């Protein structure tokens, strides 16, 4: 019994030292996958293939079009960059598409005030069939990424067994930390185990990973957004408590600026991902994105809410028969983010409510700012009736903050 206790304590101490101190707020940036997938035909489609040129052009846009200054600093490579391994077993990029190498791209990103993320897979192959990181290559690959001055690693889980994942993800976390370079760690481990306990140990994940994918890949459609949202809401009692500074649930990329969402739905995804304290990884063509979609993604108040220092993940607190849902995220300085979300598909809906219905204090007077319109609603008390008009598959989002406390008469 004593030996068992000592072993458990030793394992616990080993896990705790993997904490790397990174990503105290949800990471923000750009990720190639959803928009550009595994397009490797640079002869047919040179502007959109997975290549050095694509990432340099996206880096330029991040730096020059205001994204970096708002916090979108990660430039993340996904699958299909690998050319193979050299004679020493080190990973090398595809030399035609990445002629100057990954270290060159990292230096380029850093010169613009950005960070570079890279992708690998714990298994024999990546999801698209490129060389993966087997257990015997974990330490070697971590060292390679550090030598390239990479700032984030996304480690996928295709072609691996549950046993390999249970060994490999903690091993990679330790290997990254051992390099001495601060490399944020994005894990896909829980997504391959069904996303829920008992197969997923979220306490362990929070110690070894900075963010993790729990559910299916998002696709460029409203149906896919709702599928992800529904899974997160259904399991919010499990997922919400484990998220926080340095360890985030990741519902996957933002689709805004692509082809599958209406304007209202784009606003809705941005608001809902923000209230979930989600990483904000765009995956769109920043060279051609519309001004309307830029406005959604570059909304300063939205970003302030997403980056709130408390790092509390929000929850759905009401589901009405009218197909209106209300989400709440507690923020610093006793503020809150509230999202009124319509699943209706017919016409704008007049939703009537009060702060009392949302369990706000009766001793405080609040003010709300509409996150998208900027309108201010003053003098809100718990019993103040209000109406918000929500478009089909759209949202109204409030940033609610106290302006004064009321004197409550002594009984």
Swiss-Prot record:
Residues that bind substrate, according to the entry?
A: 78-79, 154, 188, 213, 217
Q: Name one GO molecular function term.
A: alpha-galactosidase activity
Recorded hits in Gene3D superfamilies, A to Z, give: Aldolase class I, Golgi alpha-mannosidase II
What the entry lists under Pfam families is as follows:
Melibiase_2, Melibiase_2_C
Spans traversing the lipid bilayer: none
Q: What is its EC number?
A: 3.2.1.49
* Residues bearing carbohydrate: 124, 177, 201, 359, 385
Cell compartments where the protein resides: Lysosome
One GO cellular component term of this record is: membrane
Query: What PROSITE patterns does the database record attribute to this sequence?
Result: ALPHA_GALACTOSIDASE
Q: Which residues carry this modification: Phosphoserine?
A: 322
Under the subunit heading, UniProt states: Homodimer.
Function according to Swiss-Prot or TrEMBL: Removes terminal alpha-N-acetylgalactosamine residues from glycolipids and glycopeptides. Required for the breakdown of glycolipids.
State the similarity comment: Belongs to the glycosyl hydrolase 27 family.
Name this protein carries in UniProt: Alpha-N-acetylgalactosaminidase
Originating gene: NAGA
């Amino acid at each position: 019994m004593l030996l068992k206790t000592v072993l458990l304590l030793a394992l616990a101490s080993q896990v705790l030292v993997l904490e790397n101190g990174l990503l105290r707020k949800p990471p923000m940036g750009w990720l190639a996958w959803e928009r550009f997938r595994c397009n490797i035909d640079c002869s047919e489609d040179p502007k959109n293939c997975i290549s050095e040129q694509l990432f340099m052009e996206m880096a330029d846009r991040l730096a020059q079009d205001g994204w970096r200054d708002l916090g979108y600093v990660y430039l993340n490579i996904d699958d299909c960059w690998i050319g193979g391994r050299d004679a020493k077993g080190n990973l090398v990029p595809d030399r035609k598409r990445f002629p100057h190498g990954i270290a060159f791209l990292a230096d380029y990103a850093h010169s613009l005030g950005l960070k570079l993320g890279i992708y690998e897979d714990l298994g024999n192959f990546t999801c698209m069939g490129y060389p993966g990181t087997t257990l015997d290559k974990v330490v070697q690959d971590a060292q390679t990424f550090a030598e390239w001055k990479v700032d984030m690693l996304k480690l996928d889980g295709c072609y691996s067994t549950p046993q390999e994942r249970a060994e490999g993800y903690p091993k990679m976390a330790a290997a990254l930390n051992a390099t001495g370079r601060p490399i944020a760690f994005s894990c896909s481990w829980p997504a391959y185990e069904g996303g829920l306990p008992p197969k997923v140990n979220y306490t362990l994940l929070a110690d070894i990973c900075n963010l993790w994918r729990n559910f299916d890949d998002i696709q460029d459609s409203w149906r896919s957004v709702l599928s992800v949202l529904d899974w997160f809401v259904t399991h919010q009692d499990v997922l919400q408590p484990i998220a926080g500074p340095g360890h985030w649930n990741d519902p996957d990329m933002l689709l805004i600026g692509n082809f599958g969402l209406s304007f209202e739905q784009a606003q809705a995804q941005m608001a809902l991902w923000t209230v979930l304290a989600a990483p904000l990884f765009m995956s769109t063509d920043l060279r051609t994105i519309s001004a309307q979609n830029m406005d959604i993604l570059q909304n300063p108040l939205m970003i302030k809410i997403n980056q709130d220092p408390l790092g509390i993940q929000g929850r759905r607190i009401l589901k009405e028969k009218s197909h209106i849902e209300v989400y709440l995220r507690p923020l610093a300085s006793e503020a809150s983010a509230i999202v009124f979300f319509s699943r209706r598909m017919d016409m704008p809906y007049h939703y009537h409510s009060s702060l009392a219905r949302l369990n706000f204090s009766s001793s405080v007077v609040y003010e709300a700012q509409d996150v998208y319109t900027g309108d201010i609603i003053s003098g809100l008390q718990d019993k103040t009736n209000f109406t918000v008009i929500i478009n089909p598959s759209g949202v109204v989002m409030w940033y609610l903050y106290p302006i004064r406390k009321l004197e409550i008469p002594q009984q």
